[in-house]
């Protein structure tokens, strides 16, 4: 897979960089694994905006993805690699020997016609799912369960992978993409390899309209609003925010405040916290 650049025929194509979609199969999505999804546009059940800058975009249908990999010791053949409008990662369509069809997150390097399997005594190959207790030290994994049988909850985005660092007692230490080292129960399942479509980080939308197609509305800086709309608003011209530090639209400290609960039960499972991102490398915008 590679990225594709365009000649600057228009201002939108000048900055546009996309993936070439060469790994995606031309077949249509599996109808039995597609359901309609009501889009909430950032509103809750009362119609109140709870997530700003959401709405519009192209109509989507949700693909049912198997995050549990609970069909043990049954070979499955990769029949197709499909696009998923709800995530940057691709989906691999599996045909099991017993006739069942399922979607999984497509690992990097998985080809059409390849066989994958899940279980405790399966080959150490990319795409196979197994408990963390039987994985070799130093191996890269993705789609990691936090609780056995609940399904993968971590390391599911495009290009992501965690590393098996150590095994001790009932726990396995994983180094997550955020550099955090966390303990996970050894009976939890994970998939070998990293998630595919890692080149997505090198792409560029190129124009505001393509962002609207994805359901993202414009983000207005707080410093250009009125005082009644944002704590940064008001003043004559380009006025400073008038506070010791930037805040959210609701007056809470922004950019750097730790939001994790201090008495969270899973704190004892975090061996090393993720490294803190500096303001210069964050590149955040005025909220």
From Swiss-Prot:
Transmembrane segments: none annotated. SUPFAM superfamilies: Nucleic acid-binding proteins, Translation proteins SH3-like domain. InterPro entries: NA-bd_OB-fold (IPR012340), Rib_uL2_dom2 (IPR014722), Ribosomal_uL2 (IPR002171), Ribosomal_uL2_bac/org-type (IPR005880), Ribosomal_uL2_C (IPR022669), Ribosomal_uL2_CS (IPR022671), Ribosomal_uL2_dom3 (IPR014726), Ribosomal_uL2_RNA-bd_dom (IPR022666). GO terms for molecular function: rRNA binding; structural constituent of ribosome; transferase activity. Pfam families: Ribosomal_L2, Ribosomal_L2_C. It comes from the Bacteria. The keyword Transmembrane does not apply. One of its GO terms (cellular component) is large ribosomal subunit. SMART domains: Ribosomal_L2, Ribosomal_L2_C. The keyword Ribosomal protein applies. Residues 258-287 have a biased composition (Basic residues). One of its GO terms (biological process) is translation. Belongs to the universal ribosomal protein uL2 family. Part of the 50S ribosomal subunit. Forms a bridge to the 30S subunit in the 70S ribosome. One of the primary rRNA binding proteins. Required for association of the 30S and 50S subunits to form the 70S ribosome, for tRNA binding and peptide bond formation. It has been suggested to have peptidyltransferase activity; this is somewhat controversial. Makes several contacts with the 16S rRNA in the 70S ribosome. This is Large ribosomal subunit protein uL2. It comes from Prochlorococcus marinus (strain MIT 9301).
């Amino acid at each position: 897979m590679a990225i594709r650049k365009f000649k600057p025929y228009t201002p939108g194509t000048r900055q546009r960089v996309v993936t070439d979609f060469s790994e995606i199969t031309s077949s249509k999505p599996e109808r039995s694994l597609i359901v309609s999804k009501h889009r909430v546009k950032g509103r809750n059940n009362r119609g109140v905006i709870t997530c700003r800058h959401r709405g519009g975009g192209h109509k989507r249908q949700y693909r049912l993805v198997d995050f549990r990999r609970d069909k043990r010791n049954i070979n499955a053949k990769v029949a197709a690699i499909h696009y998923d409008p709800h995530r940057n990662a691709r989906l691999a369509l599996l045909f099991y020997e017993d006739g069942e069809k399922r979607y999984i997150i497509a690992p990097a390097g998985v080809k059409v016609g390849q066989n994958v399997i899940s279980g405790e005594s399966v080959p150490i190959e990319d795409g196979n799912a197994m408990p963390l207790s039987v994985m070799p030290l130093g191996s890269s994994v993705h789609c990691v369960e936090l609780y056995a049988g609940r399904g993968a909850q971590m390391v599911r985005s495009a290009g992501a992978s965690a590393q098996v660092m150590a095994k001790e007692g009932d726990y396995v230490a994983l180094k997550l993409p955020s550099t955090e080292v966390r303990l996970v129960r050894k009976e939890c399942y994970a998939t070998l390899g990293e998630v595919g479509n890692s080149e997505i980080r090198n792409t560029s939308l190129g124009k505001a309209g393509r962002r609207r197609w994805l359901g993202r509305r414009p983000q207005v800086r707080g410093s250009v609003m009125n005082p009644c709309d944002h704590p940064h608003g008001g003043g004559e011209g380009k006025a400073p925010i008038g506070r010791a530090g930037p805040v959210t639209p609701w007056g809470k400290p922004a950019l750097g405040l730790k939001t994790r609960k201090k008495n969270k039960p899973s704190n004892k499972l975090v061996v090393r916290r993720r490294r803190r991102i500096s303001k210069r490398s964050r590149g955040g915008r005025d909220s």
